[in-house]
């Protein structure tokens, strides 16, 4: 008789996701074998914004695709609240509940649209996960408006919309599921500066509403703007983590990476080199150029 091993959930109060000893191989046990994730472990708290950065091919997207079951772990364990995703499972239990808990906004979410009206596209996810048509319809109108489009768009064909409008519709469909965790994979790809600012506002709003947010990006100024914690991957390994200033002020670490320092951090470093009194700017930890200007004015005013 097989001994049943009871799995112990490692999550504590205030935590939402735990990853333990996760490894992932492509083309495993062949001459083309590649180790994409290398023994990754981390525990993520609720209601924080995590930015995952690193070179192309460092394993960022592969990592987050494990979080909602798009990729099932071959090695290692993942807990999302009380839902277990593990190497020994044939299939993930509570799969629908997992998808309700974690949703991914892919790099070009507009390519996920496939219905003949905007309303049907937004309603698709909530209905697939068990909501009534009535409830899904109400959420379609609500989240479309949250994305800056009027209710009159509901009956429009999504394929007649502009690229930016399509992206808003696709994101509205994901928000309508009302997940506790949102993952954004290169959310600003192809956006103009105003679109980037709008996306950062969306991420801040998601945190303000109590959600946990993951963002994969190569735009370091956006990382500084929104991140509570930064995780740096290299060849599938977690090589550094901390708040944005801990990461971006570590010159010895950055020297061995291709990470481009955000302009705000570079200006602070230059000012400190000119006059050490500007070291107090590090106490303000400005996240953008406006905050930096305020911090500089404050420093000058108080001599």
Curated annotation (Swiss-Prot):
Superkingdom to which the source organism belongs:
Bacteria
Q: Describe its membrane topology.
A: Peripheral membrane protein
Q: Could you say which EC number(s) this protein's record lists?
A: 7.-.-.-
Q: Which family does it belong to?
A: Belongs to the ABC transporter superfamily. Energy-coupling factor EcfA family.
Per the database record, which ranges form the ABC transporter domain? Answer: 17-260
Which cell locations does it reside in?
Cell membrane
Main enzyme class: translocase
Give the organism, scientific name.
Mycoplasma pneumoniae (strain ATCC 29342 / M129 / Subtype 1) (Mycoplasmoides pneumoniae)
Q: What is this protein called?
A: Energy-coupling factor transporter ATP-binding protein EcfA2
The annotated subunit structure for this chain is:
Forms a stable energy-coupling factor (ECF) transporter complex composed of 2 membrane-embedded substrate-binding proteins (S component), 2 ATP-binding proteins (A component) and 2 transmembrane proteins (T component).
Task: Name a GO CC annotation attached to this entry.
Answer: ATP-binding cassette (ABC) transporter complex
* Coiled-coil segments: none
């Amino acid at each position: 008789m097989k001994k049943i091993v009871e799995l112990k959930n490692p999550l504590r109060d205030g935590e939402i996701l735990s990853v333990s000893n996760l490894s992932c191989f492509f083309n495993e046990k062949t001459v083309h074998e590649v180790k994409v994730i290398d023994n990754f472990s981390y525990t993520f708290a609720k209601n924080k914004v995590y930015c995952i950065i690193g070179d192309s091919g460092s394993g960022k997207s592969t990592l987050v695709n494990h979080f909602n079951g798009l990729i099932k772990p071959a090695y290692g364990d993942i807990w999302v609240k009380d839902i277990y995703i593990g190497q020994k499972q044939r299939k993930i239990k509570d799969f629908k509940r997992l998808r309700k808990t974690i949703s991914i906004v892919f790099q070009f979410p507009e390519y996920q649209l496939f219905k003949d009206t905007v309303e049907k596209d937004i309603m698709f996810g909530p209905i697939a996960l068990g909501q009534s048509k009535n409830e899904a319809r109400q959420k379609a109108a609500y989240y479309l408006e949250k994305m800056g489009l009027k209710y009159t768009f509901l009956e429009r064909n999504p394929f007649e919309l502009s690229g930016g409008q399509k992206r808003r519709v696709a994101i509205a469909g994901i928000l309508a599921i009302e997940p506790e965790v949102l993952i954004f994979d290169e959310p600003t790809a192809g956006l103009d500066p105003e679109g980037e600012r709008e996306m950062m506002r969306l991420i801040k709003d998601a945190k303000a509403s109590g959600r946990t947010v993951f963002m994969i990006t190569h735009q370091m100024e956006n990382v500084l703007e929104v991140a509570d914690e930064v995780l740096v991957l290299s060849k599938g390994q977690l090589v550094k983590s901390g708040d944005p200033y801990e990461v971006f002020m570590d010159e010895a670490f950055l020297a061995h990476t291709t990470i481009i320092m955000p302009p705000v951090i570079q200006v602070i470093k230059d000012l400190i080199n000119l006059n050490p009194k500007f070291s107090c700017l590090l106490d303000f930890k400005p996240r953008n150029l406006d905050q930096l200007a305020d911090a500089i004015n404050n420093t000058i005013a108080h001599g």
